[in-house]
Amino acid sequence: MSPGLPVSIPSQPHCSTDERVEALAPTCSMCGRDLQAEGSRLLPCQHLLCKDCYQGFMQELGHATRAYPGKLISCPGCQRVYLTRDVTEHIFLQCFSPVKPTMARNCSECKEKRAAHILCTYCNRWLCSSCTEEHRHVPAPGGPLFARAQKGSSGVNGGSGDFALYCPLHTQEVLKLFCETCDVLTCHSCLMVEHKEHRCRHVEEVLQNQRMLLESVTSQVAHKKSSLQTSAKQIEDRIFEVKHQHRKVENQIKMAKMVLMNELNKQANGLIEELEGITNERKRKLEQQLQSIMVLNRQFEHVQNFINWAVCSKSSVPFLFSKELIVFQMQRLLETRCNTDPGSPWSIRFTWEPNFWTKQLASLGCITTEGGQLTRADAAAASYGSLQGQPSFYQSHQAPMAQQEALSHPSHKFQSPALCSSSVCCSHCSPVSPSLKGQVPPPSIHPAHSFRQPSEMVPHQLGSLQCSTLLPREKELACSPHPPKLMQPWLEPQPPAEQESTSQRPGPQLVSQPVCIVPPQDVQPGAHAQPTIQTPSIQVQLGHHQKLKLSHFQQQPQQQPPPPPPPPPPPQHAPPPLPPSQHLASSQHESPPGPACSQNVDIMHHKFELEEMQKDLELLLQAQQPSLQLSQTKSPQHLQQTIVGQINYIVRQPAPVQSQSQEETLQVTEEPPAPEGPKPALPVDKNTAAPLPQTSGEETPHSVPPVDGTSQHSSPNVVRKHATSVSIMGFSNTVEMELSSTRLARTIEPQIHRVSSLTAAPTHTIPSLLSGPPQTVSSLMSVSNHAMPSLTASHLQPVPNLVRGTFQSTSNLRGDSSQAITGLASNHSQAGPSLMSGHTQAAPSLATCPLQGMPPVSDVHVEPRSVSSPGSGPAAESLGTRDGAESSLGNALCKMESEDCTRFSDSVGQGPTASSLDGPKDLAIPSELEEPINLSVKKPFLAPVINTSTALQQYRNPKEYENFEQGALELDTKENSDIRAISSEPKIPYVRLERLKICAASSGEMPVFKLKPQKNSQDGNFLLVIECGTESSSMSIKVSQNSLPDASQGPGLGGRKVTVTSLTGQQPQEVESTSEEHRLIPRAPGAKKNTPAPIENEDFCAVCINGGELLCCDRCPKVYHLSCHVPALLSFPGGEWVCTLCRSLTQPEMEYDCENARYGHPGVRVLPGLSMYDQKKCEKLVLSLCCNSLSLPFHEPVSPLARHYYQIIKRPMDLSIIRRKLQKKDPAHYTTPEEVVSDVRLMFWNCAKFNYPDSEVAEAGRCLEVFFEGWLKEIYPDKCFAQPQQEDSDSEDVSGESGCSTPQGFPWPPYMQEGIQPKRRRRHMENEKTKRVSFRLANSISQV
């Protein structure tokens, strides 16, 4: 293809924008400056050079300005070599270069070059005011004037025909023909002269053929590019995996070092204490003997002095008188015996085996690899390549013979470093063989790259470690070796030739000491005894599991009889090892181990690693128990971060042997990943909760969530949380709800419409429903528990029921300009808020009974609106309780009072709800004996009391619950005789709440309800405060009234607008009710409505909540943009149209005009993907998520500027990616529904992993996940989808600088070698991590 052919490429209409921008890069590849229209060069590799760089580059190569053909030129960008004749002028830049703002603003027509005022867009010339009048465009047919005006400039439309390239020979002729024989562009004149007999065609025909060829080539390039991106992503994941594994093993080694140091200090301190005890006992005995001798000596001196004085005195009579006493005393002293034997010389010494412990330290641990082919030659090449500054991945292609030699002679390539600087370091060490000198690798090699195996250690190298115990400390330090780092010591046995050569060398012949390992019996009391595994000639090199006392390992007496000469050590120490001679005798008859023995050793290694790490975790859990009690809701991965600190990884891989008891023990200390399949909710009601022998004092707020449904009843290690329900007006039965982890609840009612908020309800508070006066009650009531901050915040099954209606007009009822009453009922884990509006000033109630003195009006039973599908119907608010934190609602009296304080003689038990008072201690007490609670300021005006009684029956799903529970709502309306008097002065509501008989919680405190007006009472803003001890919660209540109703309307709703606000940031939804429609008519409980309400479409798109050109569904109120709908539509349909949520899956009413429909036309090769049935189901799932108001943060990817997000989240996922992969033309199109569900769950998992559990985004993600699982169960009722496994990674240490996938595509690393060098992150101090953890815990406590 000729260099001039690329001129036709920009005119292709199907060329994508990204490819066009890539081909027309505006900067020079050498200097990086903007290119000029003249003199720029285009290389065959599509790199660009400016005029100056090209000339300088050619001069540096020794060429002239005009390069000779046949010379070579190297591209400065990609280093590829081309012929200089292939470098062409950059015609693209001339064709598509924009008008520079720095161009001259002078007139191009007149000679005076006056200032230009107008730009002629037709010929791209600046004109002054005088030339503008004369400037006209009257093109003559075939005239050259128009062509010259367009020479070298883009036309008006920017098409291929507007840009003209003129012949260099015939300057007036345009190159409109293409000679296929010569492969060049030509004009008519050249065609007649040089290309007479050649095959020439018009440029447009050639463009059409070339376009088809380029499209096929472009598709192939795109496929190869996608495969390369996938491969590069996998390799990059491997790089970060290696980095993560390196940090993990490094932390394990550090932990082993720390544990060994602690054990050494403990043992040394024990020995010192033992020494002090022995010496102190010996010293005490000698001091007692010395004291007795000194006392006897003083008595002798005293008697001797007395006798001398008596003899020397001149009076003899006293001497003779006391002679007998003196003789008796002297005789007694002579007969007194005293132990004067000091005993034999007593010596004490400390004996230990330095050689044994040196060997043990030398075999402290090993580094094993699983998977991947990393030979020793590759490791050595990587080590030496890193020293020489060369990339290690090029070494394998340069010296194949060196690799074979290294593999055939591993002992010469991987000898251990010399332990002594000279052949004999001291008189007690054996000489080092001269053959070992010169084989020591350079000391600058990183120790992580040095590999050696114990079987290759020269025997007299081991012998050189055996120094005498009586040497001075300096000599012992000189002889002690550095612990070598081993790599798979048992995978490559010693060659026979090496064994023969070592057996012939002089010096003490030592082999690795056989170690017999027995599992510790005190780790698991119920565990079965594991068989003893012996490894005769292999050093079992365990990791940090050697940190405990050596009594856990029992040595068999057949192989290692205890030597009698040394004294027996304390019980906590292991028997001393064999002397070198006994080691030699016991190891001479042992053969090298086979593959089975190596596998057994590997099995034991994993088993003991798990056991010891489990013990470490238990100790850490006990040490940090207070902090753990406040962080039970955190994921297992986050729990490890807060507990272990620097230990960033804990092995959870079970050993490949029978370790059932071990796994049962691990269930107590670690939170396992979520089990597969949803966990059914418990159908808790009065009947099922009654036989539970549970009291309010038995609750255990600090508990570990159970693993699955089976372990909740069988495993004794599972701790349950008994939620104490609050008995209100006779409901004294307690409810026991089992907790699960934050991502286990997957069950939800199919009739769910929209999840709006969650409520955090502790066990000893009353999340009872409170409806305030002139405003709707918010659908979120959060009561914080400082001892247990929202243990599980995602398990609720809210079923919103919005009941709108009017009360039937009666003869004794009159219209009133009253406010709305909102009755909310929280029922177990299912919440059904029923919003009922009536003419009343204010009546906050839970559930009411008829009042005395008024004839009750006929009960009005209202059924909740039936919802055909979870996503259809108008949006409704929802109220839920967290994790079944139960609130049992009883009945309460709520009435309005005037100044005279009307007395009621009717008892509480009378009425339709008297049957619910079944508690033994809840008696029917007359209401006049109870003093009401006043929550508002009394007004001086009077009003007659009019009572209206209504009963609201709560619907319960028969599939999940077995019975119904009724709650009665009684409205007491009160009106003023003079409406003008009311409207002329400020309205202050007057509310009286009857005292509720409430069973006190375990803390013994009762809740206190306060109603406070905010700012201006005329606005209808009130604050409802609920206080229970030190905890408090509040909600804002507002009722807006559009206009005062007429008296002729009766007790209708009067066109009032009720707003239910949610504290989770969801948009308030307004429900307008009028007296002409939706009247509450007395009917049977099972009766249905006569005429359904007409569908009023929404004003904003159900997905993006924006306006514009919207497409209305004929079966539901939702409207969509064409691009927001799933699947995205290409054109507006004609006639009746239904959305994906309303369209039938089995018999669709219509087919959408979308990409998938056009992609599936006959003749188009279709890649394997979802079936049509599964495609419709998955589109319905995704659209239901997009229509949820909580899904707005998940519509688009996280901004690439949030670098911390892509450091923590390795696999970003959002709804836009899922929608794109649902298209059949996408290379990553889904093939099974499991992939769709896995991506959606991955999106929720990323949300829960990155955000704090108490944040709004995390709470929205949990609500949306519950909503999705309900839809999934409805669409796929008979299919079970596996739960995603938790990622085995630590967000603190796994840095994803370049591992994130941004929306613009795969982030390729730069060409330089520094691009693949990982950045080193600053390690945090331990105290900083502790502060950060405590700060998160404090935030989780203060969150309401």
UniProtKB/Swiss-Prot annotation:
Region named Disordered: 478-513, 541-600, 655-719, 861-888, 903-924, 1284-1344
Q: Which organism is it from?
A: Mus musculus
The protein's matches in Gene3D superfamilies, at most eight in alphabetical order, are given as: Bromodomain-like, Classic Zinc Finger, Zinc/RING finger domain, C3HC4 (zinc finger)
Principal localization reads: nucleus
Q: Which residues bind Zn(2+) 1?
A: 107, 110, 131, 137
Domain (Bromo): residue spans on this chain: 1169-1275
Q: Which cysteines are joined by disulfide bonds?
A: none
Its biological purpose: May function as transcription repressor; The repressive effects are mediated, at least in part, by recruitment of deacetylase activity. May play a role as negative regulator of postmeiotic genes acting through CBX3 complex formation and centromere association.
**Where would I find the PHD-type zinc fingers in this protein?**
1098-1145
- Its protein name is Tripartite motif-containing protein 66
